[in-house]
Amino acid sequence: MTLKTKTNKNINIMNSKYALPKDGGLIADVALQELTQRFERIATQVYENEYDGVNYVADNIVAAIGAHKADRPFALGLTTGKTPLGLYRELVRRYNKGEVSFANVAVYSLDEFYPITPAEAQSRNYRIHEELLDHVDIRPENINFPDGTLPREQLSKFCAAYGHNKIDLMIVGVGEDGQVGFNEIGTHANSKTRLVQLSYQSRKVQSGAFGGLENTPKMAITMGIHTIMKADRVIMMAWGEDKAKIMSRVIEGEVTSQVPASYLQNHSDIEVVIDEGAASQLTRVQTPWLVGPCQWTPKFTRKAVVWLCGVVKKPILKLTYQDYLENSLGELLEQGRTYDQINIDVFNDLQHTITGWPGGKPNADDSTRPVKSTPFPKNVIVFSPHPDDDVISMGGTFIRLVQQGHNVHVAYETSGNVAVHDDVVLQHMDAAHELGFADEFAKVEEIVKSKKAGEPEPRALLNLKGAIRRAEARSAVRSFGLNPDTNAHFLNLPFYESGGIRKNPFTQADIDIVVKLLRDVKPHQIYAAGDLSDPHGTHRTCIEIVLEAIEVVKGDEWFKDCHLWLYRGAWMEWDLGSVDMAVPLSPNEIIVKRHAIYRHLSQKDIVPFPGDDPREFWQRSEDRTQTTAKQYNDLGMAEYQAIEVFVRMF
């Protein structure tokens, strides 16, 4: 997509620019499709990104509605949550273009919280109306939702009737534990529409929208597995790397009540539609040499050899001919190199990713180094989605770049204001009260008391929270020698400032802010968060904005010497098969990095949106980098205390 306008029109993030360059892998061949999918128990379509997958599902829905000739409305089952949002927007777009009508369609929502009213913004009823139904020509009498307002004594009768009519096409998503709707772990295959108790994990996932776990419903009404199985046809969707682990179990694992979505393997007409992130742990993606012929590039060869080392528990240079043959890598031995030459080549390839000079070592032979020695010093921009991602995810490298004399700038893309507890604000204002600003403390206390669960926070409170996070970020970079007054940039990208968990789509205004910074600094190196999995969604939006900005500046003279390095956040790390640069950290550098993370006091201990990992961010960061160092050591490299790794996008 090329930008041709300066308007603030929303950018379609599904049509993503963010995809790592393809480098080797399974050879696509229609004739071999049955072979390459032989581990999969459900017909599965893998698309490069959500945009392509959504279009495929939308094509199927539009075609099914158009082909429906019965005298009753076409019955369409709708899933809820984040997964279908892109699909609903695409269906609205097609309706507006005159490609589909919903006048003869009846919809059935998969689930609803209980108790809840349709007017509450967190209800499934409200969200599906907001995203789809309010924008198309569906008849009100054809809209069906579980009724979250019914008295308990009326629910059994309601549930006995709900969703048991003929459903022509059922669209479902999959929860991170394999839930379909609110069919939790342990659900029986014969379950029907019913009231269910929500698990702690499900309530925790939903708690952000409700303003905390204490405000999140403990129950829900959901179609059961048996109800879903009665649909004529089912399409299951999943997007993003955070769904990869569960989708591998749903698609390739045994049918089990521990993964309720796996029951759908037994449906006679089901299809799974996922993007490459959600497919990343399928056998044909993770270990494609087990299923078919491959293109053996140097980096793909490294991926296979690193995997083999893990299987046989040996370092690279100890792998034998038999190790390759007995673990389905015979094809690699047929590419013109002996096994020991492959070992040496991969060892050298991986070793050459290691450097203590992330900005390039001046006056040194750089023929095998990941970064050129010239120019020196380099102009560098570190993009940080939230005000602490820079030090959490690449703090050691950041410190090295500063201490080695480069002109380093850090750009905090969002304010991070919603991730500050109210108590933290009151604590800061209490200090102000001690200094004589009693009126201000009282005002803030009133603002906090006026908040309503699930509604956007008051702007005055968000401004205070943003100020707290800016002060913490300045303190962190000051701790290792960066001047925050000249080299720390708080972009406050507008898309983030919704006041709630759900952010606005990014627009040209966001892109223009990043473009200006790029042209001001003219960086030789750009570091950006390349997370494919992010419980907030902010990281993904931020990398898309950076890439859109790069599209604008790529014709500038300075850009020809620029390279983009991707780091990962506090959730996952790059696979060693894809790493382009590895920066080792000494024990002292880990302490300096940890102390920088400590400066983000509002994010210590308990934070509003911690994800599933109970550890503090500094602990996650250290465990992640120390695990990477151990992986390098296990492969036969030098033993380091910790290593931060990066992938070069260009």
What annotation goes with each model-predicted range?
Residues 2-75, 365-367, 374:
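N-terminal glycine-/serine-/threonine-rich phosphate-binding loop
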Residues 3-24, 36, 226, 232-330:
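ATP/nucleoside-binding phosphotransfer catalytic cores, i.e., glycine-rich phosphate-binding loops
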Residues 571-628:
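A conserved mid-domain beta-alpha-beta active-site/ligand-binding segment of alpha/beta enzyme cores
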